[in-house]
Amino acid sequence: MTGFMKGAMILTVAGLLVKVIGAISKVIVARILGGEGVGLYQMAYSLYQLIISIGAAGLPVAISIMIARKVGQEDFRGARHIFKVALTTMGIIGVLLSIGFYLAIPYVIEVGLITDSRAEGALLAVAPAIGIVSLLACFRGYFQGFQNMLPTGISQVCEQLGRVLVMVGAAIYFLPQGIELASSRAALSSVIGVGLGLVVLLYYYGRESKLEGQVYSLESPSKIIQELIVLALPVALANIMIPLIGAIDLWLVPQQLMLSGYGKEEATTAFGYLTGMATSLISLPVIVTMSLATSLVPAISRLHRERDQEEIHHRMRTALRMTNIVTIPAFVGLCVLATPISQMMFNTPNAGGAIAVLSASIWLLGVQQVTTGALQGLGHTAIPMFTLLLGAILKILLNLYLTPQWGIEGAAWATNVDFGIAAIANVYILYRSTSFQVSFIEIGKILFSSLAM
């Protein structure tokens, strides 16, 4: 098994474990704190996730690209120099972000961005985690640059496990003292979780044998920081685009449903079928494709540095083949069995239509993720941001037209077009830049086999 596939497998297993642990914790915490307590916790946690997605989301990709290039030259000293500069820079930025977040909390509540002032304690609790996440991202990017996904995978599981155990324990222990205190102490779990993840990565870093390799002159810190920004910023912007479009949908889709004759409660219910039920089902298979994309970035980056076009094509073909093998049967199966699955999992058959339509996004999003990984590995980190933006603009326009015509299924079709346009644009740009061609015969065979089952 190649290092690329081994890395993807490790990240897939870790991703599934994180999902399972997270799903179990949601049920337990909801039973302990109830809707009110969970709401206070989520107000803080959602804002925290938005901040770290802006501040640190692009770092692992950017650092892994820069490290992989040095590893391809056997310049291990240069790779460690890049890591140390990135770690120092992000350590300082992380501390400043944490302090800024802490000081901004009263104003965030005052202007109404957080509508319940009782969430202040939970917001204060998550502030230190922002600084730690910046360091965590640097370490993960470093190991990914060496195509060593084990530290990243184990740290993700430990982070989630630590967060969940502290969250549940704090919720149980502090609930008798009031829902506000219980939710704020449960929010401390974010700090404990990322802290535990960082300890795991420090352990692996300490164990690592420091290879010397070839000796090259070291780049200046300013040049490293400049390249880091150029690579990381588009990735961070692309990462926040999907939740941003989700926020637009939150306002736009129910409004369009009501314009077509839905009552307020009916529109909210239909929106729940799409975002709370259908979306949750498509998120599981794409764990595999996200892992493939993450593992693909440093592999392609290293090969691109070595100008090994044939091996680049081989890695991309392998990644897309695995994507098709996993996502096409999942898409077909979910589409055909949408209504029974809706009844079994959500105790209503009414989400079946939205699930059936949105199931196509399993394949489309999978292709978009893997081709994004390939483009990032080639150094084109800005392109996936623009292809996602193009898809998002079309999605908004189609929501305005299709949702009043076809109801919630129209909104699901708009989402399919969003991911589909981004995927097609990525594939086209890969063809133009590397002459890589997708095997439509292979896709047809997998689709036919899936339909025949």
Regions found by a protein language model. Give the residues of each.
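N-terminal membrane topogenesis motif
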Residues: 1-21, 77, 81, 219-242, ...
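Membrane-interface junctions at transmembrane-helix termini in multi-pass inner-membrane proteins
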Residues: 133-155, 360-390, 401
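Transmembrane alpha-helical segments of multi-pass transport proteins
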Residues: 239, 244, 441-453
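Alpha-helical transmembrane segments of multi-pass membrane proteins
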Residues: 99, 103, 114-138, 332, ...
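Interfacial/gating helices of multi-pass transporter permease domains
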Residues: 29-50, 179, 183, 223-231, ...
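Membrane-water interface segments that mark the loop-to-transmembrane alpha-helix transition
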Residues: 62-106, 121-122, 313-327
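Membrane-interface helix-loop junctions in multi-pass transport and translocation proteins
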Residues: 149-151, 161-199, 382, 392-424
